[in-house]
A protein has these predicted regions:
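Active-site phosphate/pyrophosphate- and oxyanion-stabilizing loops and adjacent acidic/basic residues
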Residues: 27, 97, 131
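Short Gly/Pro-enriched turn/cap motifs at secondary-structure boundaries
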Residues: 165-171
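Hydrophobic alpha-helical segments typical of transmembrane helices
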Residues: 43, 55, 76-77, 95, ...
Length: 181
């Protein structure tokens, strides 16, 4: 991605299975995030990044609907959640910070209660920011850490995180973690 050095391209092999066949990595995300035909996914991040592109494709794979923002705007995102009754979304911590900086009268005028899962990733989220988001949106925040290369991931729900603030969660998708100092 170029966030920590020279931009790189990650060439992944094409999946040779027919479209409707369940692929383990897609099925794992579907089970974790409960994608189904009732899913309405808000994509506030650019599709040239692997994560938003992948989540959009997975939503469509399981019969859901995607709402793609042309560019990120905090109030517009809240408006879209209410307008489309968004059930799933994906964010980076900077977006949380920007939404929390909106005047309270703006934040509270939109109904965001349709959300079942608000996924966040890409960078560590400050504890105070994540606490404020969970207080505002409820325990729908789900965090994951992973790499474009597909070399493993961790995931944590709001409930787990509130018990272990700052944790990155547990290994996901049969991944084996090695913690080194």
């Amino acid at each position: 991605s170029g966030t920590t050095g020279m931009p790189k391209g990650v060439k992944k092999p094409l999946i040779e299975a027919p479209w409707p066949q369940n692929i383990p990595i897609f099925q794992a995300a579907q089970l974790r995030y409960q994608f189904d035909t009732e899913t309405v996914y808000l994509s506030p991040a650019p599709l040239y990044h692997a994560a938003p592109l992948g989540f959009n494709m997975n939503t469509l794979r399981y019969g859901g609907t995607t709402v793609i923002m042309e560019h990120y705007d905090s109030e517009e995102a809240l408006k879209l959640i209410e307008q489309h009754k968004v059930t799933h979304s994906q964010w980076v911590p900077t977006m949380f910070v920007r939404m929390l900086k909106l005047p309270e009268v703006v934040r509270t005028q939109y109904d965001v209660s349709s959300q079942r899962i608000a996924i966040h990733a890409a960078a560590p989220c400050p504890i105070a920011i994540k606490e404020q988001m969970i207080n505002w949106w409820g325990p729908v925040i789900s965090e994951y850490y992973a790499g474009t290369e597909g070399n493993g991931s961790t995931t944590i729900t709001s409930e787990e995180w509130l018990e272990h603030k700052g944790s990155v969660g547990r290994a996901a998708n049969d991944c084996i973690l090695h913690i080194l100092d």
